[in-house]
């Protein structure tokens, strides 16, 4: 029904003169119907009435400010691309409804937010191409999918990187269903349980982060002198800088050396995460089985890890290893059970609240509980389908490097878990600024928190800076930080 789709487009872009955050300012039309669709859309545009917004017979009012009117005009003048169709508008702070067709997906007008009554359009041939073009943007607030084939619409909707997707509709809101975006459209939700939980606080008093200084010493190595490498893309890799640091035990004995990761190593880890995006598409059951297998492999080497913890910290590590195994089992159990909801909304239809992985998460692991803290943060994140870059405990990094072989033998795809060792202060800022890292969690030195949040503001990255009581099972509390909620509005019936 092309006519209904045309009405939907008119409502999406020219509601409030296109000056709304969820305006449907980019139009993707199937190539076979593009000419017919554009003709009908232009005819509908010609009938739009422009004038005093207090007149109930008026469709389009004035632009919010003359500066915004000038900005829209300047943007169009700076990029005279495609074919422009424009209706007339009265004098004053008005801008005529505008349609620009024939644009390339990389055109600045397709990539930048115009925030006005301007609709830019391009065509696609297949649904796969449509999804690629739709997701080729910095923003991700809302999208509309129009199709008579509901199966096709339900195939496309979950693939769109947006916080809310309307099927055969637009601009539908309700307090029962969350509204919010991803990428540079921001984070957080209004409405729904996910919107409410954003304003809640834990009942228990928050834990305090402990910053622990590394042990020093001048003793020689007791056995073979080893330098642990980084773990990137399922392989051990030498640091780009070539630098390493000695790690000493509490009595000054040299336990080994660890690599010092740099910005370049972080970039390599991000590339490995990008190559492992298929992990998000795997079933919760498969992710659970891999986590169970990881727990079994760690259990088989429990004595070895407990001994390593004692040599690093001076304390018995048996309880920490047992708790780490328990956290893996807990995350595995949640992998296929932390599911979404079906909301009753005021249309003849439903809104599906789907839990989706955040993407790539950078995690600064706590100094204390070097094994338990790492696994407690890592396991829920990968259980939800995320890829992670872990900056190991700064004073006790060797326990993380011992984990490489457990990961290698647990059927975990390369790139899902990447482990860096080195100074958290060297890795925190690049993590927060990197455009391909979707969230940063910091359980390390609290002095790093402010810098992380300031650096992440440039790309609206989700941040979580705080402390947890690692002796408790925090898996359920971590899961909301590891997921985004996408609401898909689906009509049914006549």
What are the language-model segments listed below?
Residues 151, 252-338:
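Glycine-rich loop-to-alpha-helix module at the N-terminal edge of alpha/beta enzyme cores
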Residues 121-125, 418-423:
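Short acidic-hydrophobic, aromatic-tinged amphipathic segments that line or gate anion-handling sites
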Residues 26-31, 60-71, 98-101, 114-126, ...:
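Short, well-ordered beta-strand elements within core beta-sheets of diverse protein domains
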Residues 129, 349, 426-427:
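Short acidic active-site motifs
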Residues 1-104, 133, 167, 211-213, ...:
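ALDH superfamily catalytic-core signature
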Residues 243, 250, 333, 337-413:
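Conserved small-residue-rich beta-alpha loop and adjacent elements
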Residues 199-255, 337:
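Hydrophobic face of amphipathic alpha-helices that form TPR/SEL1-like repeat modules
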Residues 39, 70-73, 151-152, 156-215, ...:
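Extended, hydrophobic interaction surfaces within ordered domains
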């Amino acid at each position: 029904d092309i006519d209904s789709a045309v009405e939907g487009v008119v409502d999406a872009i020219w509601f409030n003169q296109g000056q709304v955050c969820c305006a449907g300012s980019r139009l993707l039309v199937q190539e076979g119907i593009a000419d017919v669709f554009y003709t009908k859309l232009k005819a509908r545009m010609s009938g739009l009435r422009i004038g005093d917004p207090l007149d109930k017979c008026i469709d389009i009012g004035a632009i919010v400010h003359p500066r915004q009117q000038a900005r829209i005009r300047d943007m169009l003048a700076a990029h005279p691309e495609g074919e422009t169709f424009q209706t007339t508008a009265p004098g004053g702070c008005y801008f005529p409804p505008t349609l620009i067709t024939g644009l390339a997906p990389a055109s600045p007008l397709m990539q930048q937010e115009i925030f006005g009554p301007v609709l830019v359009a391009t065509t696609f041939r297949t649904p796969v191409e449509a999804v690629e073009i739709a997701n080729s943007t910095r923003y991700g607030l809302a999208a509309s999918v129009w199709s008579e084939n509901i199966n096709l619409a339900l195939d496309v909707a979950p693939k769109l990187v947006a916080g809310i997707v309307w099927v055969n509709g637009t601009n539908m809101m309700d307090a029962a269903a969350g509204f919010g975006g991803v990428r540079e459209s921001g984070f957080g939700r209004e409405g729904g349980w996910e919107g409410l939980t954003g304003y809640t606080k834990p009942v228990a008093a928050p834990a305090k982060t402990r910053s622990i200084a590394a042990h020093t010493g001048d003793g020689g190595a007791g056995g073979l002198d080893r330098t642990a490498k980084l773990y990137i893309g399922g392989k051990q890799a030498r640091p780009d800088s070539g630098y390493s640091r000695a790690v000493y035990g509490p009595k000054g004995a040299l336990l080994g050396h660890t690599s010092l990761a740099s910005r370049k190593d972080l970039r390599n880890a991000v590339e490995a995460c990008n190559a492992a995006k298929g992990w998000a598409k795997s079933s919760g059951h498969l992710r659970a089985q891999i986590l169970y297998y990881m727990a079994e492999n760690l259990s088989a080497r429990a004595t070895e890890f407990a001994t390593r913890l004692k040599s690093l910290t001076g304390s018995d590590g048996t309880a920490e290893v047992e708790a780490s195994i328990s956290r893996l089992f807990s995350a595995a159990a949640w992998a296929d059970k932390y599911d979404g909801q079906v909301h009753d909304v005021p249309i003849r239809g439903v809104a599906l609240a789907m839990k989706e992985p955040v993407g790539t998460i950078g995690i600064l692991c706590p100094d204390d509980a070097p094994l338990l803290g790492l696994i407690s943060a890592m396991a829920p994140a990968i259980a939800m389908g995320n890829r992670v870059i872990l900056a190991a405990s700064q004073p006790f990094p060797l326990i993380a490097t011992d984990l490489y072989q457990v990961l290698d033998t647990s059927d975990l795809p390369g790139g899902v878990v990447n482990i860096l060792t080195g100074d958290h202060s060297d890795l925190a800022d690049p993590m927060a600024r990197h455009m391909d890292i979707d969230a940063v969690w910091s359980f390390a030195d609290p002095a790093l928190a402010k810098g992380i949040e300031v650096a992440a503001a440039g790309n609206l990255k989700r941040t979580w800076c705080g402390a947890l009581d690692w002796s408790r099972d925090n898996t359920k509390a971590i899961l909301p930080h590891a997921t985004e909620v996408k609401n898909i509005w689906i009509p049914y019936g006549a």
